[in-house]
């Protein structure tokens, strides 16, 4: 039996988190989706950091709003990870200061905090911190899949 690596621990945590009802398209706003999303970003960031350190950076650009320091999916997740302590100060019900939002399916508009958003795909969840967007399936699940493929290809 192989010893469990840190990467395996992150993969287990990521898949456990993704099984949460909070990541269903029809999840209500009453679910604990914000804490589940934060947990997901913590795990995915750890996973992508380990992959990067192993020389297997996940660097696709599709759907990533490339500007400034955000250059690929890994840097987008890192940017979101770096904002998590700031989000802890958001209080429920303070919509105008709420920086973490989500949108299901295709659409566009403004969140209560004034941030403009677009979500380009049906049957997809988009999560936003301020004006930065990450898609659950097209980006987060793809990044996880690429790490798994690179990791298990080595074994």
Protein language model features and the residues they cover:
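Acidic, Ser/Thr/Gly/Pro-rich intrinsically disordered interaction regions
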Residues: 1-34, 60-155
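Short, hydrophobic, well-ordered secondary-structure elements
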Residues: 32-54, 78, 82-85
